[in-house]
From Swiss-Prot:
It catalyses: guanosine(1207) in 16S rRNA + S-adenosyl-L-methionine = N(2)-methylguanosine(1207) in 16S rRNA + S-adenosyl-L-homocysteine + H(+). This is Ribosomal RNA small subunit methyltransferase C. Coiled coil: none annotated. One of its GO terms (cellular component) is cytoplasm. It comes from the Bacteria. Keywords: Cytoplasm, Methyltransferase, rRNA processing, S-adenosyl-L-methionine, Transferase. It is found in: Cytoplasm. GO terms for molecular function: 16S rRNA (guanine(1207)-N(2))-methyltransferase activity; nucleic acid binding. SUPFAM superfamilies: S-adenosyl-L-methionine-dependent methyltransferases. Its EC number is 2.1.1.172. It comes from Escherichia coli (strain SMS-3-5 / SECEC). Monomer. Belongs to the methyltransferase superfamily. RsmC family.
Length: 343
């Protein structure tokens, strides 16, 4: 995280204005500017575990990871710098949470790429902190206002749910496929064999739909789910509970917090981090799977057909199969063999 994002570069044009400020950084924190900007004091709150990992190395306890920020997370801050995400409901959840905690009179800065829809911050905050655009550069907008009224925030009002073949899926803003089962996951589910047994790890679990659908027709599997997203972790826990299915769910940057080996690893890996295209997570998943699969164990993932995963699979496992495909998606399978162990 040495290079700054365009949004951070816009903020740096105003760095002198922040030297005496006690700043809370929040939102889509994709670089380490919160740890490096010269301020009177800096805190950071993120819902993304991998962003917290980077920031906490430099900021210690002043970097926090959780679904909902608390009063302790914003203590003594007189300025909010909020990085607008690509998902408007996610921004609303986070901003209403933060503004309900910060004192009236707090300086509010919102920055983001134009293509992310940052302009809608003006309307969203109109009743609480009227914003004006103060800079435009690097295809980003920077908005400033002052908190005039604290909103009432109730996290429970942001929950949603949908049904898939009789299963209840619980969702929150920022969770992948929040409004329904995506086509890629549907294709992957179609390949899962009933009456499977053993330990299954669902990496990048989202709302937990892959795991609960798998467990319904294979009740003897033992489930572990992980995701970098705090909303996804909470949504998966709620989805498991709603369907009476047991499983361990925790935050992890791919395998960073995963212990032990599994008989199967399933995933619909992300290839976007915020507004940026990133294949890092999927490549880390493929390369790291050999350290978390039992002999004869299987990695099964779905991905957009154009993504360059076959080479990484062959390089890591020695071979791969395409077991299902459509015009847009492919389901890949790779088996843990002696050949893979040498990789």
């Amino acid at each position: 995280m040495s290079a700054f994002t365009p949004a951070s570069e816009v903020l740096l044009r105003h760095s002198d204005d922040f030297e005496q400020s006690r700043i809370l950084f929040a939102g889509d924190l994709q670089d380490d500017l919160p740890a490096r900007l010269d301020t009177a004091a800096s805190r950071a709150h993120t819902q993304q575990f991998h962003h917290w990992q980077v920031l906490s190395r430099q900021m210690g306890d002043n970097a926090r990871f959780s679904l909902v920020a608390t009063a302790n997370d914003v203590a003594d801050c007189d300025t909010l710098i909020y990085y607008w995400p690509k998902n408007k409901p996610e921004a609303q959840f986070q901003l209403m949470n933060l503004l309900s905690l910060l004192p009236v009179g707090t300086d509010i800065f919102v920055v983001g790429e134009n293509r992310s829809g940052v302009r809608s911050a003006e309307q969203m905050l109109a009743d609480y902190a009227p914003l004006n655009k103060v800079d435009s550069a690097r295809r980003c907008g920077l908005y400033f206002g002052r908190l005039e009224k604290q909103p009432v925030f109730d996290a429970n009002k942001f929950w949603g749910e949908y049904n898939v073949d009789g299963l209840t899926v619980k969702t929150l803003p920022g969770v992948f496929s929040r409004d329904g089962l995506d086509v890629g996951s549907q294709l992957l589910l179609s390949t899962l064999t009933p009456h499977t047994k053993g330990k299954v790890l669902d990496v990048g679990c989202g709302a937990g739909v892959l795991s609960v659908a798998f467990a319904r027709h294979s009740p003897k599997i033992r489930l572990t789910l992980c995701d970098v997203s705090a909303p996804a972790v909470e949504a998966s826990r709620a989805t498991l509970a709603a369907n009476g299915i047991e499983g361990e769910v925790f935050a992890s940057n791919v395998f960073s917090e995963v212990k032990g080996r599994f008989d199967m690893i399933i995933s619909n890996p992300p290839f976007h981090d915020g507004m940026q295209t990133s294949l890092d997570a999927a490549q880390t998943l493929i390369r790291g799977a050999v350290r978390h699969l039992n002999s004869g164990g299987e990695l099964r993932i779905v991905a957009n057909a154009f993504l360059p995963y076959p080479d990484v699979l062959d390089e890591t496992f020695g071979f791969h199969e395409v077991i299902a495909q459509t015009g847009r998606f492919k389901v890949y399978r790779a088996i843990m063999t002696r050949q893979a162990k040498k990789g």
